[in-house]
């Protein structure tokens, strides 16, 4: 490919609405263009990067025994109604009607469609297990699409679905996909970590997320410094506290005026106590009914843990009007004593101490000496808070570190969440009808490209790992009008092609500085400069985009010298 024949519309400035590095650089490098909110055109170089990523995903899926198919993006409502997700999924599901008034949606995922397919095709245990996948455009009507390809409404995804006859088979399929994902991200040259995760709206018994490590990541990972434990903070367990056999006696409750002190910080400063001496009482609404959750004043409620404990579909903070109704006080003064809420839950850390300061369910008033066992009606104590670096690993007790990551893959063991309501069954050896056990496995292919850039960039542009780069190498011909120089550049180009290198020849009539800046911006891993002065000295200048290290390759014996240098550059990426 010649640069002069390729459409690479690079820009000097990023668009004003681009917030994150990947959005800025993908746009500046001419790889994407925005069509409308959350929807992008993949330009030639952007599409090449996506296709290279998809090719590696496809190879590893095939190696793991999965079979590729293609399902429609448009899905009938009746399947979603049958699974129970038509109402549950909410406004992210884009719904519409055809001319006959029939309801449809644009698929954000394909559990219903694949289960419907398999239940109509697979009858016997002899046909199991089976694992089917596709790489397809999806649509999710995000309320706030942002960050370019990181959180768009339309995106490219690989989704796979396994069907097994029993739990043991489902576990085998799950871990086969887990290993395939490990292979994918290693081959892509990314620094990543697999972490325990919450299953969210997909459901299922357990799941793992694959996180690309990046300081700009939206997710926080809690990882043990002593063992292999790692989890998304939504999922990360906090070990139960050491509870004394007996706690010191607590005196009578005492009302304390706290005029105008609504926040934990304000109350504790006013009373001259640490935030750990206070219990926060949070009023929430779970599937339309009020509930209360108690955590220590210096802790943060983990609403995902509470939602899983309640097994509810919707959970949100109560509106101020409801808080006033159930507590008799404005926001900021709720407490567990005399609270007019039927279900009250407390973080298990509160078992380790007593004699708390709480809200009094009365304006401008708090309580001292509150004993939860004595003074409050707690339905259950459980792990309800967000883990912190001060907490110990729940597995081995060693310190926890928090890092940032970007979710690019997710594997779920679904169990019978979809196969049971959709009646996806088979006949076993004894002729008995049984429900298939499922798993589902997703990789955000377009998101992988964006997250790669979030992890690998510098002040000059993108730093692509060789497997993802639109072109692994660029040959910059400094004087394409000089027939001898261009001829030599074309010889080197042919040699690189013969070695299987995806290379572009920059034959534009531009200043060398422009060519160098574009090569860095687009992120070409292997950069070669062919110029008259270098040829006169018998060398070609080579630069490793990742390190910036320059070396000289001899014109005589160029092929072997390049092969050796390329291997060294790839080794630097762990490839």
Swiss-Prot record:
Disulfide bonds: none annotated. It comes from the Bacteria. Its EC number is 6.1.1.15. CDD domains: ProRS-INS, ProRS_anticodon_short, ProRS_core_prok. Keywords: Aminoacyl-tRNA synthetase, ATP-binding, Cytoplasm, Ligase, Nucleotide-binding, Protein biosynthesis. InterPro entries: aa-tRNA-synt_IIb, aa-tRNA-synth_II, aa-tRNA-synth_II/BPL/LPL, Anticodon-bd, Anticodon-bd_dom_sf, Pro-tRNA-ligase_IIa, Pro-tRNA-synth_IIa_bac-type, Pro-tRNA-Synthase_IIa_type1. One of its GO terms (cellular component) is cytosol. It is found in: Cytoplasm. It holds the Pfam family tRNA_edit. Gene3D superfamilies: Anticodon-binding domain, Bira Bifunctional Protein, Domain 2, YbaK/aminoacyl-tRNA synthetase-associated domain. GO terms for molecular function: aminoacyl-tRNA deacylase activity; ATP binding; proline-tRNA ligase activity. It catalyses: tRNA(Pro) + L-proline + ATP = L-prolyl-tRNA(Pro) + AMP + diphosphate. SUPFAM superfamilies: Class II aaRS ABD-related (SSF52954), Class II aaRS and biotin synthetases (SSF55681), YbaK/ProRS associated domain (SSF55826). One of its GO terms (biological process) is prolyl-tRNA aminoacylation. It is an enzyme of class 6 (ligase). Catalyzes the attachment of proline to tRNA(Pro) in a two-step reaction: proline is first activated by ATP to form Pro-AMP and then transferred to the acceptor end of tRNA(Pro). As ProRS can inadvertently accommodate and process non-cognate amino acids such as alanine and cysteine, to avoid such errors it has two additional distinct editing activities against alanine. One activity is designated as 'pretransfer' editing and involves the tRNA(Pro)-independent hydrolysis of activated Ala-AMP. PANTHER family: MITOCHONDRIAL RIBOSOME PROTEIN L39/PROLYL-TRNA LIGASE FAMILY MEMBER, PROLINE--TRNA LIGASE. Belongs to the class-II aminoacyl-tRNA synthetase family. ProS type 1 subfamily. Consists of three domains: the N-terminal catalytic domain, the editing domain and the C-terminal anticodon-binding domain. Homodimer. This is Proline--tRNA ligase. It comes from Nitratidesulfovibrio vulgaris (strain DSM 19637 / Miyazaki F).
């Amino acid at each position: 490919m010649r640069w002069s024949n390729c459409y690479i519309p690079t820009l000097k400035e990023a668009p004003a609405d681009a917030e994150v590095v990947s959005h800025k650089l993908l746009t500046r490098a001419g790889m994407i263009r925005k069509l409308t909110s959350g929807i992008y055109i993949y330009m030639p170089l952007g599409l090449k990067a996506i296709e290279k990523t998809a090719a590696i995903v496809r190879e590893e899926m095939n190696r793991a025994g999965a079979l590729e198919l293609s399902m429609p993006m448009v899905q009938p409502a009746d399947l979603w109604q049958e699974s129970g997700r038509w109402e549950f999924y909410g406004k992210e599901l884009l719904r519409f009607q055809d001319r006959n008034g029939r309801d449809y949606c644009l698929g954000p995922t394909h559990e219903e469609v694949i289960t419907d397919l398999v239940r109509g095709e697979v009858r016997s245990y002899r046909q199991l297990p089976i694992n089917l996948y596709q790489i397809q455009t999806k649509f999710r009507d995000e309320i706030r699409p942002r960050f370019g390809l990181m959180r768009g409404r339309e995106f490219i995804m690989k989704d796979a679905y396994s069907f097994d006859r029993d739990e043991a088979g489902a576990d085998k399929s799950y871990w086969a996909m887990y290993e395939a994902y490990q292979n994918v991200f290693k081959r892509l040259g990314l620094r990543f970590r697999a972490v325990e995760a919450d299953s969210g709206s997909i459901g299922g018994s357990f799941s793992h997320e694959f996180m690309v490590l990046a300081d700009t990541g939206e997710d926080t990972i809690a990882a043990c410094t002593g063992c292999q434990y790692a989890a998304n903070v939504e999922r990360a367990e906090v070990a139960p506290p050491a509870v004394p056999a007996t706690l010191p006696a607590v005196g009578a409750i005492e009302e304390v005026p706290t005029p105008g002190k609504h926040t934990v910080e304000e109350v504790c400063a006013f009373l001259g106590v640490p935030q750990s001496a206070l219990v926060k009482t949070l009023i929430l609404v779970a599937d339309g009914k009020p509930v209360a959750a108690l955590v220590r004043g210096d802790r943060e409620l983990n609403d995902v843990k509470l939602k899983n404990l309640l097994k509810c579909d919707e959970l949100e903070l109560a509106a101020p009007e409801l808080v006033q109704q159930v507590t008799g006080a404005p926001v900021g003064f709720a407490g567990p004593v005399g609270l007019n809420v039927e279900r009250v839950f407390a973080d298990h850390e509160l078992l380790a101490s007593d004699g708390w300061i709480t809200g009094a369910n009365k304006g401008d008033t708090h309580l001292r000496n509150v004993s939860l066992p004595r003074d409050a009606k707690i339905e259950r104590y459980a792990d309800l808070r967000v883990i912190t670096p001060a907490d110990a690993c729940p597995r081995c007790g060693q310190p926890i570190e928090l890092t940032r990551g970007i979710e690019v893959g997710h594997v779920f063991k679904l169990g019978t969440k979809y196969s049971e309501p959709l009646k996806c069954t088979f006949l076993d050896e004894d002729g008995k009808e049984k429900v298939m056990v499922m798993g589902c496995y997703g990789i955000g292919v377009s998101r992988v490209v964006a997250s790669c850039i979030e992890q690998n960039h510098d002040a000059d542009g993108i730093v692509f790992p060789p497997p993802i780069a639109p072109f692994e190498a660029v040959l910059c011909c400094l004087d394409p009008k000089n027939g001898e120089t261009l001829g030599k550049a074309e010889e080197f180009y042919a040699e690189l092609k013969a070695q299987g290198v995806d290379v572009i020849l920059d034959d534009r009539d531009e200043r060398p500085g422009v060519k160098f800046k574009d090569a860095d911006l687009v992120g070409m891993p292997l950069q070669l400069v062919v110029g008259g002065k270098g040829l006169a000295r018998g060398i070609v200048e080579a630069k490793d985009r990742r390190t910036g290290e320059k070396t000289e390759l001899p014109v005589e014996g160029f092929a072997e010298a390049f092969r050796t240098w390329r291997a060294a550059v790839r080794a630097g990426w762990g490839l």
